[in-house]
Amino acid sequence: MKENDVVLKTVTKIVVFILLTFGFYLFLAGHNNPGGGFIGGLVFSSAFLLMFLAFDVKQVLVALPLDFRILMICGSLLSFLTAVVPMFFGKPFLYQTDAYVQLPLLGEVHLTTVTVFEAGIVLAVVGVVVTVMLSISGGRS
């Protein structure tokens, strides 16, 4: 790939922003509408992979100092803990609880443990997909 491919790099910056925004929307809409942690994680992963294709892998990893293997482990652990912790309070595995919280700028917000579980899924999916793709491509995993 040419080092001075201005069009590709410019379009990539715009498309990555759109992909990250859409992935965040899919993540948040997932417990009430189609979407969720898995598909949101895949869209986030596609944004990272597009950056790796348009820019040098090493350059992107320097700009985003993320260890995707650690991200995968943290996501799996977060989802596992969200599923197991209710058992310590006499509730069944994967018990869901929710609450309405008054936040200063947002007003009343509905919070659920499903959102925390789905956040773990997002982190795990991004970690797995990017690690596998970097391993296949020969980049640092």
Curated annotation (Swiss-Prot):
GO cellular component, one term: plasma membrane
Keywords annotated in UniProt: Antiport, Cell membrane, Ion transport, Membrane, Transmembrane, Transmembrane helix, Transport
Family, as annotated: Belongs to the CPA3 antiporters (TC 2.A.63) subunit B family.
Protein origin, superkingdom: Bacteria
Protein's GO biological process: monoatomic ion transport
Name of the protein in question: Putative antiporter subunit mnhB2
Membrane topology designation: Multi-pass membrane protein
Lineage: Bacteria, Bacillati, Bacillota, Bacilli, Bacillales
Membrane spanning residue stretches: 10-30, 35-55, 70-90, 116-136
Organism of this sequence: Staphylococcus saprophyticus subsp. saprophyticus (strain ATCC 15305 / DSM 20229 / NCIMB 8711 / NCTC 7292 / S-41)
InterPro entries in the cross-refs: CPA3_antiporter_subunitB, MnhB
Quaternary assembly: May form a heterooligomeric complex that consists of seven subunits: mnhA2, mnhB2, mnhC2, mnhD2, mnhE2, mnhF2 and mnhG2.
Localization terms from the record: Cell membrane
